[in-house]
Amino acid sequence: MTYKFPDNFWWGSAASGPQTEGAANVDGRKPSIWDHWYKIEPGRFFNDVGPTNTSNFYYQYKEDIALMKQTGHNSFRTSIQWSRLIPDGIGEVNPKAVDFYNRVIDEMLANNVEPFMNLYHFDMPMSMQEKGGFESREVVDAYATFAKTCFELFGDRVKHWFTFNEPIVPVEAGYLYDMHYPNVVDFKRATQVGYHTTLAHALAVKEFHALEIPEGQIGIILNLTPSYPRSQNPADLKAAHIADLIFNRSFLDPVTKGEFPADLVEIIREHDALPEYTEEDLAIIKNNIIDILGVNYYQPRRVKAKEYAAHPDAPFMPEHLFDNYEMPYRKMNPYRGWEIFERAIYDIAINLRDNYDNIPFFISENGMGVEGESRYRNADGMIEDTYRIDFIKSHLKWLHKAIEEGSNCHGYHLWTFMDCWSWANAYKNRYGLVEVDLDNDFKRTVKASGHWYKELSENNGFED
């Protein structure tokens, strides 16, 4: 069967500044929370590999953009590091950072690769974290100023802007589950961070629309993880509804509809965790919705009704309201510990079609991390990652079905272009179309999937 996609479909990939640029201590950049956390707890990073060098994009961006073109990219998303552009979080703009991002943008355009630019990818400047991070209203305003600065500096050439990547992740990883700095476990503080992140997003949208950039669009990148109940039993259905409210609709509803779900607000109120807010700020959220949505999809969430009550003195967690459910015989990526469930990408698209005014969206991340890929190297030195090609195809088939049924999808970006640093997992799992050899001066080698991806893009689809 032939799977053809709409004209002008975005084929490309996504990455981020902190995961690829390296040059962490170069040309005026100051520490983010990742530099600080690695400094004080290097043992929490796989093989003690920190964020200092990552994949060396700062120095090899020209080679990398040429490889993007070679692997069929017509678009690519990365992020501007706040700690590089405005090293103190507020105040003076770093001219060397402006020069770097200008060169990257211009090189992309010269190679017919459309830049998609994100403003925040988990990388709070340490100077801002010391003020409380997104617990602080002052930092919300500082972020809005940073966003406006980016729009003014680069908006003449960058038309596709995104305020945050996966904003739920710093909330849950940094303030609930002790997986990111500042390693807080406190539901009320987490809700304050989530609310202030939403407000910061809305303020950036307001600044962007005020500039009236021709053909400009602004959106947000959300990791939508559909919540599937174990059964159709009412208690299981309620568990799935609650998980969906907390992990998906907490951001999806306010950025598309301008308001938080009433059921979610009630849950937060019941657990005495309402954030500090003002009516003026709620109006800003209400009046500044997105133009386009980026959807990151990796895995489903399967849940069931609680089997045992939580300890009454334990800190409240979302899992006090549902249990995670491990479906028997599910297909897994054993390296990442994630279920592979391709149909969910269809379910997301149809949900957006039916419940969110069929908002324009694109798949902004989807990918497969594999450990020890060098064992798949052939005699010519190329990694034969046919498993990645199969993974992409199987998801695109379901995306194609959703498009045929009227969902408003405009593109597909793989995570990721080249092997990159994955936070505390460092380089444990590799996701790229292009191999990066950390032991050989960051040498780049296109994998089998990269050659196939060029065919996919050139044909605007594939046969299978």
Go through each PLM region and give its residues.
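Active-site region of glycoside hydrolase catalytic domains
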Residues: 1-45, 88-90, 98-464
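Catalytic domains of carbohydrate-active enzymes, especially glycoside hydrolases
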Residues: 60-81, 287-292
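Glycine-rich, proline-tolerant flexible connector loops at the mouths of alpha/beta enzymes
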Residues: 80-93
